[in-house]
Amino acid sequence: MHLGSLTISRFRSCDNVTVSLRPDLTVLVGENNGGKSNVVDAIRLLTLPLSGRRERYPEDEDVRRHATVSNFQIEGVFRELGDTLKGLLISAVPDPSKNEAVFGYRYESRSERAPRGKTTVWAGRFDTNEPEAGSTDLIRHVYLPPLRDAHQALGTGSGTRVMALLRHFLPKDQEQDFLAGVRRADARPDTLTTMNTEIGNALGMLTNGVRPQTAALDFGAETLLDVARDLRFRMADSGLLPEDIRASGLGYSNLLYMATVVVELAKAKDADLTIFLVEEPEAHLHPQLQVLVLEFLLDQARQSADRAIEAGKPEGRIQIVATTHSPNLTAWVSPMHLVVMRSRRRDQNGVAVSESISVPIAELGLKPKTLDKISRYLDVTRSALLFGNRAILVEGIAEALLLPVLAQRLVLAGDADGWLRFKGTVIVPIEGVDFRPYVEVLLRPHGGARIADRLIVITDADPTVLGNRKIDLENLAATHGAPQALTVLTNQHTLEHEIFDAGNEAFLKSVFLRLHRNSRRDWTARIEGVAVQDRPDAFLKLIEAKKTRKGDLAQAIASRVAAGDPFVVPPYLADAIRGAAQA
């Protein structure tokens, strides 16, 4: 069994969104305020924590601000139920011919009729159908919050995390034996005895004339919480003596905190399904550790799926749902595991509102060849392709190097808001001319939603190549109902040719001679010695003859533009920059 889909209505940023989830691992990616954490919180409300101690409760503030009714609703569809589970969850199975169960959760805001708010849980086809007693206990969750300071979480005297571990490992009937084992010695040191004597004498002089008092300084009766507050985590590199947690870096301290939560998964065998919710596991971790964390989580899910189910015992399945802002993590997993969460603006009764939308890559209907190409690209480049709602696709690294400096220094100079919008645009060098897979994944719709609102493609016209790349891509966007979302800008030849032809001969001469200091005669003979209209072509031949790499030339151009040298931006590049900077 696994949570197959989650429909969230009127909950925070989610007006009415359905999020599809994979049986083993789902990674929620996308921009800030896209709704990733709200999906996690919805699962926390719908299901019970594995520990039995609920930490997330509904609040009036959870109801979406622009909702027409003062409640929110969460509905989960659980799939791949076996015959035994269908029997145990019979009240939650709306259609006996399908191996699915439905559980729902509704919260109504506080009112005169319900001064504390009203929570309703239902199962099956109708939201008036109460779950059978004990059925919700079969589905649990473990929550790992985003860690900003593991030193604080592990090293303070509150003992919260240690207490959770003690409760996990210590049976209730063994608690007193444990406390006896860690209790302080009955004998008190001489210093403490002397202190008590002196305090008693002083107190006696103050109270003997009225009502004599006695006092003693001693240890309090120890409870399990007292022990938890006294215990401290220590850690060091393997082979060294563990030190106080604050001597370790935040990254490894975060991993230690994760380890203290992961051990709770051992109890997953007591539930049929445990959903492990992990928010931003990449915090303070370098890329290799990020990958190891996600690999470990995926292994937990797969091992639970491979485990043989014993008759009469829970299935013990583990399902992972993680959120991330890390391109490293999205690159490591298959795109099939990725669900893009993003915000979309729309008009509601004359008021502009934003809402979360969900785009599961696995359900876009992409061909395997397209998915493979996207997967390989993300794996190699660690690109932020899926993290923004506007993107510029370019052929190679040269355009990607030049666009930011041209935007900041020239095209958008003086337009602070436009520059910020441009900075929020993802620039994707695909190192080729096959833009189709990237346009497909960014513009193909799912339930009326798509990853990108604005997509700009910059490419060469390539007159020697059959077909028209611009028309082909525009037709593709129209097929997906997004002709307004795509802009294809082409030059007449190549990037270097267009830069020269825009009126940058003197600029390129300076740059070329910086790269090839002993080639002044070559420039004079091969560029200045030909007709003006032929010089752009001659420049291409010269840099090819000198084996000038496109990336090196682009770096040199960007450096001089940044230094303030006069430069004319080719019109098609200026159009691309302005298009990305539009509000």
Give each language-model segment a name.
Residues 153-156, 163-278, 299, 305-307:
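Extended helical coiled-coil dimerization/tether regions that scaffold
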Residues 129-202, 206, 236, 478-481, ...:
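Coupling/switch segment of ABC-type P-loop NTPase heads
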Residues 48-71, 271, 303-316, 348-349, ...:
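Flexible phosphate/Mg2+-sensing switch loops adjacent to catalytic phosphate-binding sites
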Residues 96-148:
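Mixed-charge intrinsically disordered linker/loop segments at interdomain junctions
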Residues 40-97:
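Conserved P-loop NTP-binding catalytic core
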Residues 1-28, 33-48, 234-381, 567-568, ...:
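Switch/communication elements of ASCE P-loop NTPase nucleotide-binding domains
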Residues 78-84, 111-112, 148-151, 239, ...:
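Conserved nucleotide-binding/hydrolysis micro-motifs of P-loop NTPases
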Residues 315, 333-583:
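Acidic, divalent-metal-binding catalytic cores of TOPRIM
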